[in-house]
Amino acid sequence: MIYLDSAATTFQKPAAVQRAVVQAMRTMSSPGRGGYTAAQQADELLFRCRSAAAELFSVPSSEQVVFTMNATHGLNIAIKSLVRPCGRVVVSGYEHNAVTRPLHALGAEVIVAAAPLFSPQETVEAFERALAHEPDAVICTHVSNVFGAILPIERIAQLCRGASVPLIIDASQSAGSLPIDFSALAPAFLAMPGHKGLYGPQGTGVLLCGAG
C-alpha cells in the first residue's frame, strides 16, 4: 500500500514509536500523583519528553511546554486565553475548524487576511492591512492542511510583534516536517498534534506557550 494521507495522520508509525508505546503501557504509572518508584519514573519520563520538545522547537524553558490531547485541544486553550467574547480576531484564509468553531462560539468578529494561494508577499500585505483593525489576536496556520501552501509565518510573526498583537500558530501540518524556531517567532502560543509529523500516537499534542 502507498499511503498518501499523512496530513490526517502518519501511518505506519516507526518501530521505535511502537516499542515506546507498548513499553509505556506495560511499565508507566501515574506521573505527578504518587511518591512510589513507578510514579517517580513516570515523572522523569514526562520531564525528559518536555525537555526534548523544548530543545527540538527552540523553546527557552521546558516549563513552556504543555502536553494536550491534540492540536484542537491546544488551539482551544490558546484561543480562550486570548480572545474575549465578541472580540476581534485576524485569521488566514486556510484555518481549520479547530480555529473557526471556537471563534464562532465566542461570537468573535473574524477578519480574514485573504490572499491568492501560494502568494507569500500578498499574504504578508493582507495581514498588514488586517492588523490595522486592532485585533485581540492573530491566528495563522503554518501550512494549509488542504492545499499544502506554506505561509510566510516568520514575516507574519514579525508584523504581529511590531503591532504588539499576540499570535497563535497552528503547526499541525508543519511540526516535525519543517524547522520551527519558537524563540525567533515569539508567538503567544504554538499548537501541534503528536500523531502527524512527530509520528506519535493519536490522542497526543503539544502546546508551546510564550513567556509573557
Regions from the language model: what does each represent?
Residues 1-212:
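Pyridoxal 5′-phosphate
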